Regions:
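Alpha-helical transmembrane segments and their helix-helix packing motifs
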Residues: 2-270
Length: 270
């Protein structure tokens, strides 16, 4: 009897220390996607607006760190940790972030292709994207038109934001695909990260920031700051940055991760 209990305890410990199978992770994300698709438009809007506002803290924190550090080659290694803060707030706070939904809600659609489900995914994407961008714009406008921060910090806002606008359309699109890929992989890793969830978010968001990969929400806080301060035109804000970063993030999140993961586990099941 004692031997059996010891064996059961040992098996339990082995299971606790073993990474969950990929199909279990897939099913967890799939069910989360189903839950998101059942949410009302009003709830998605409010959560998406909160997420857009929260992402503004990525620019603020990175700028505050940069303003208090010397201009040295190693400075971004520290300041880009600030870029992670917006993602930490949004994801741990379970707010609706557009790039997160490119993975979760697309899995149910890929498994059961129906017009009604496609329209529901389109509804969720549109509502969350618009709410995120509205929140990002409000935050950026407040930074540009209030005295929340002194002139020195606002100058850093401009420097960081102008750097994100420097690449051409194609470069922003391709880099955006890499950003979408990484954020979707973050979502894939989170369900069973348990106590390591915070570090998963920080490390991946830090990599996105350090590599200067454009994120359609975090990056558009910077974009909208320049627009609100009169540094760029409306055409530049939308045509040069918003459009390519959006396309790139969707390609990375859907084509490179969601479709690949779906194919891997559905083919295995068949």
């Amino acid at each position: 009897m004692a031997t059996r209990k010891a064996q059961e305890k040992r098996e339990s410990e082995i299971q606790d220390r073993t990474a969950p199978p990929g199909d279990v992770v897939y099913e967890a994300i799939y069910r989360e996607g189903e839950h998101e698709l059942e949410r009302r438009t009003s709830a998605l809007t409010l959560s998406g607006l909160a997420a857009g506002l929260s992402m503004g803290f990525s620019l603020v924190t990175e700028s505050l760190l940069r303003a208090h550090l010397p201009d040295a080659p190693w400075t971004p290694l520290i300041t880009k940790f600030g870029y992670s803060l917006g993602f930490v707030i949004v994801i741990l706070g379970r707010q609706q972030l557009f790039t997160k939904n490119t993975l979760t809600v697309i899995l149910p659609l890929l498994k059961e292709w129906k017009v009604a489900l496609l329209l529901n995914v389109a509804r969720l994407w549109a509502v969350v994207l618009i709410a995120n961008l509205l929140g990002a714009f409000i935050f950026a406008w407040l930074l540009a038109h209030t005295n929340l921060f002194d002139e020195n910090i606002r100058r850093v806002f401009t420097e960081i934001s102008m750097k994100s606008m420097a690449p051409d359309f194609v470069t922003i699109l391709v880099r955006g695909a890499l950003a979408g890929w990484l954020i979707a992989l973050m979502v894939w890793l989170l369900p069973f990260a348990e106590t390591g969830r915070l570090w998963v978010i920080i490390i991946i968001a830090y990599l996105v920031g350090l590599a200067e990969l454009p994120h359609v929400i975090a990056g558009n806080v910077e974009n909208f700051y320049l627009l609100s301060s009169g540094s760029i035109s409306l055409g530049q804000a939308f045509g040069h940055f918003l459009v390519p970063s959006l396309i790139g993030n969707v390609i990375g999140g859907v084509a490179l991760v969601a479709v690949g993961a779906h194919a891997e586990f559905t083919v295995a099941d068949d």
